[in-house]
Amino acid sequence: MAFRIEDIELGDDTSLLAELVACWRASVEATHTFLTPDDIERIAGYVPDAIASVAHLAVCRDEGGKVAGFIGVDDAMVEMLFIHPSLRGCGLGSLLLDHAVSEHGATLVDVNEQNGQAVGFYEHYGFEVFDRSETDGMGDPFPILHMRLRPTSHGSA
């Protein structure tokens, strides 16, 4: 299956925003096993605004145009990277991250410590932990690993 990545301006495209939120939810439900259903519902209330406000948003679509995943970058920070769970392991995360690094200078990411698969993905790509926070950005008790791309690693210039 072929995929394409495109930078997008979300604007007032509510149907695309709904697709991205659905991708976020499916991904989080499959990977963030440390969150309760109530946690997911609470966080879901913030997701549309977070997606709409990110400086650079890139979407990965399948041959039929359906959203397969997306990445958001603000300054050098990867703010979000979500892949539809049915397509995990196909290399889409690396494709989106390659795009974010080469096109938007992404070198930083914050990862939930309890999401071991994501931590492993970023480490394999070439990120390393440089700091840790006991709580997430909303003050909830979900520890965050602050990671940066090693200068000589995959994807870096």
Identify the residue ranges that each predicted region occupies:
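Conserved catalytic-core motifs of GNAT/GCN5-like acyltransferases
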Residues: 110-112, 128-146
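Conserved acetyl-CoA-binding loop-helix of GNAT-fold acetyltransferases
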Residues: 89-102, 120, 124
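Conserved GNAT-fold acetyl-CoA-binding loop/helix
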Residues: 22-48
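Conserved beta-hairpin
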Residues: 55-69
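Conserved GNAT acetyl-CoA-binding A-motif
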Residues: 102-114
